[in-house]
Every structure is written in structure tokens, then in C-alpha cells.
Amino acid sequence: MRVFMTGAGGGMGFESFKAMLPDLGKLYDLVLLLRDSEKNRKLFAPYMDTKGLTIHWGDLLNREDVADCVQGADIVLHIAAFVSPQADYFPRKAMANNYGSTRNLIEAIQSLDQGDSTRFVYIGTVAETGDRMPPIHWGRVGDPIKPSMFDYYAVSKVAAERYVIESGLTYWVSLRQTGIIGPAMAKIRDPIQFHNCLDNVLEYASDRDSGRLMRNLCAYEAEGTLDPSFWGHVYNIGGGESCRVDTYTMYKIMYGEIGIKNIDYVIDPKVNATRNFHGQYYLDSDKLENYLHFRSDSMQYFYDAYLKELGPAKPFGRIICKLPGGQKLMGAIIKSTFNKLLESEHGPRYWLKNNMEDHMPTGAVARPGRPFPRKPAKWTTSPIGTRWCPWTTATTKPSPRASSTGPIWPGLPNSGAESSSPRP
């Protein structure tokens, strides 16, 4: 069997590549289309002589490069994407890459008369469903597609996913990726961290589990054990209950690891969005797990990666926080590192200073006269901060309601024609 994978030089792609290595030359051969960059050349130098591996140096927007790789492929794993936060800075590039590459791949499959044989695996995103703040933070495939304002990445992925679904391919699937925890997330230093609301929730998945997901899909298909009913659907990728967390709790644990027990020393609600991001807990992420059995990690994997990224700052911070007034001092040091981000192009303070009125309704800036209230100085004493717990700390899937007239799940509307059991 022949597998063609895009995006192997990225986070999820490289983890998938590493997970697939033991199978190469045995269960299937692997073809990669990689951008010819110094980074990719260095990253894949140790694997150039791997049995069952073929590397094409080229561009997904070049139709000839794409056709060369698609020809004879039994499975196409389209993992490559121009993602946030980079997509926020270059929205046209996001659309050209994310939609354009998907279209090129599908057109190549069809032009090679492989539309009835090639399995096409598209990686979508949780951002497609946009803002799902409590109390509508439990979601499922089939919920409204509504990217948040200014989320050009999400718009490009919606367009690409629709193209896949309407392509006419016999075997396709869209797997909507969530926030990916791991070393890469621990390294993020970008204003996007202030776009995430403190009472927002996400059901994350680890980079390693995401790689295992791709490997298992290919292995099961090669072995003939993947249920044919898997194809022709959209699924949510999620790590399950152990990977569900709200933003505030995540920060509380992260900073608690270095000794800061009072999160108000670090978190300033005035610089975090109150809406217009994305995220939800999934009612249906177990479906994909039941097919592909990929879950292994929990949120602790991310906290460990964060502490490793801190390096020498971790023991230093713990020592400081044990001293009188140390927690407050350490909090001030951490806050000072945020200032440059807040005042950069996509930072809330930048929007405020430059009177970017179109960004104000997103809730990312506290300002008098706007259609949302002035934000409190402390999260733990704010109206939201004191009432959010029952919603977001409950990470166990809610039980279906017995009523056939009310919502089946909290925060989700009933069509009026459904029974009391959740949709399949």
C-alpha cells in the first residue's frame, strides 16, 4: 500500500511521520511532499535512506508536484496547513495555502481517475465552529459552522472542508483537529494567547496522540481492519476527559507549578478577550477513539512540557515564590514579559491605541462606552470568575435529558423531532 502525506515538516505531521516509521516497507510505503527549505532538509536528513520512504521536494501549490505524489496513492493524508497565529498576519496566504492545496490534491486524484479508490484524509479544525463560550460549550459535529471574527485561518479551513465534502470522492473523511498540546504549545509567545478567554474551554489532543491517530488509520486500512463505515464523515479529534480544561484552570496549574498560588498576581482580565475565540468540550470525540484507538496523553503532558521549557527559570521561580512577597514579585516579572506582546500588531493594547473599532466588539479590549461592561481588575472576584466553575470544571460528559421537547444536552437546541438520546 502507498500513503502520501503532506505537512510532514509541521508539528502534527512530524509526529505522524515518526509514528509511521516502524511500518514503512512492511505495512505500506510513504511518500512525502516537502518544501525545499533549510529547516526541512536538516529535519529529514537522518531519514533519507529509510526503506519504504520517498521524499519529493516541491510545493503543494504546484499542480505537477502534487500530481507526481498523488499518482498511485491509496491514502492521502492532508495534514499541511498555514495555521494561526501566522495566518492572522497573512490572511490571503492562509486561504491560498489551505484552500488551494486541498483543491489541488482533490483535482489531482480526480484527473488521475483515482476518485473511487484513493482514501482522502483532511485535517479540519475546532476553529470552524468558533466561539462556544459557556453555557454552550459542549459541542458535536453538526453544530453550526461560524468562525470567529478575524479568524482567517478558520475561514480558509471551512472553505477547504466544504470542498472535500462536496468533491464526489468515494472515500473521504475530515478530522477536525483541536488545540495540540506539547512542546510547541509551551513555546508560544504571541498575542493570540490573549485572544483566548479565561472562561473558555478546550478538549485538547497531544501531538503524540495526533501522530498515533494518523499511524493507526493507515495501519488499520493496510491490515483491512478499519471499519468501512469510518469513511464519508466528519469527526472531532479530542483527547477525552483527561484533556478537557478551561483557560483559567490551565493557567492556575501552570503558574502553581512554580509556586504562584494567587493567580491574580499573573492574570489581568483587562487584557484577555471575553469572547470571539474558539473551543468546546466534545460530546462525540469518543467516536474517533473507538475507530482508531489513539488516546494516551493527558493535560499533564503539557504541564511537563511547560516546566521543561522554563529551564533554569523553574527553580529560580520556586525559590522566589517561597520568600515574603515573592509570589507578587514573580507575578510582576511574568506580567512584564506580556507587555511587548500586548502592544504588538495583534495585541489588545495595540488595537486600543490605534482606535481599531472593528476589533472592539470581539471583547478583547476593556473600554468605556463599548457594548460590553468594563472588566474587573481581578479575575477571582469578578462576576464571571465567581460563577464560571460549575460550567467549566465539569469535564465529564453531561447525561442526556429525558425530555423530548427541551434541549437534549445543556446548551444545545433540540430540533423538536429527536428522541431523548444523543445523535449518532
Where are these regions (language model features)?
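Substrate-positioning beta->alpha
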Residues: 196-223, 233
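Conserved glycine-rich Rossmann-like NAD(P)H-binding loop of the short-chain dehydrogenase/reductase
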Residues: 24-39
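N-terminal Rossmann NAD(P)H-binding glycine-rich loop of SDR-like oxidoreductase domains
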Residues: 1-23
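Glycine-rich NAD(P)-binding loop of the Rossmann-fold in SDR/ketoreductase-type enzymes
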Residues: 61, 93-104, 147, 151, ...
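Conserved beta-loop-beta element that borders a ligand/cofactor-binding pocket
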Residues: 158-183, 229
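Conserved Rossmann-fold NAD(P)-dependent oxidoreductase catalytic core, especially the SDR/UDP-sugar
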Residues: 82, 103-150, 173
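Mid/C-terminal beta-alpha module of Rossmann-like enzyme folds, strongest
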Residues: 217-291, 297-305, 310-323, 327-386
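NAD(P)H-binding glycine-rich loop region in Rossmannoid oxidoreductase-like domains
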Residues: 49-97
